[in-house]
Amino acid sequence: MNLPNKLTLTRILLVPVFMIFASLTGLSGIADGSFQPTYYLIAGIVFAAASFTDFLDGHLARKWNMVTDFGKFADPLADKLLTTVAFIYMMRDGVCSPVVLCIILAREFAVSGLRMVAAGAKDGKVIAANMWGKVKTVLQMITIIFYYFTVALTGNVLGQTCASIAYWLCWLVAVVTAVSGIKYLWDNRSFINTAK
């Protein structure tokens, strides 16, 4: 297994680490004084590190000519797992609307389903992420990192204000996610039309 693929697997392995620290405190703790900013900060650092591997694995794969079918399939899957889990915790905190999460999940299930159809087609095509998909992923990661770092660093002072900004960023994420999903399905509609 080459280094870019190892970085992709590392991103997947960092998901449960992020979950542990994100589970240890909640935004509701700001009101009753039980909020633990350190846990949010660690969760943010873990998420940022995992997000960096997304940039690094793609960069190295292209630079060293190590692009593989496994990487094309596993890299966006790792992104989906990482960001979706983070948005679930943000929904718990009341920062991410359930509607936003439903849009994200619907897009990811639809795209993943199409990828499986394409992989199982006669020519066995592996569909890589398009530009809209990459923009969507970057915006999702920026929103999540913004939320965890700003809330952790401002805590009781500006925590709720930062959370409100993150709330509207989540809606922007929903719009871009929906557009990227529609574009992806449209560009690969031949697999839908020929699916039996």
What annotation goes with each model-predicted range?
Residues 1-196:
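Alpha-helical transmembrane bundles and membrane-interface segments of multipass inner-membrane proteins
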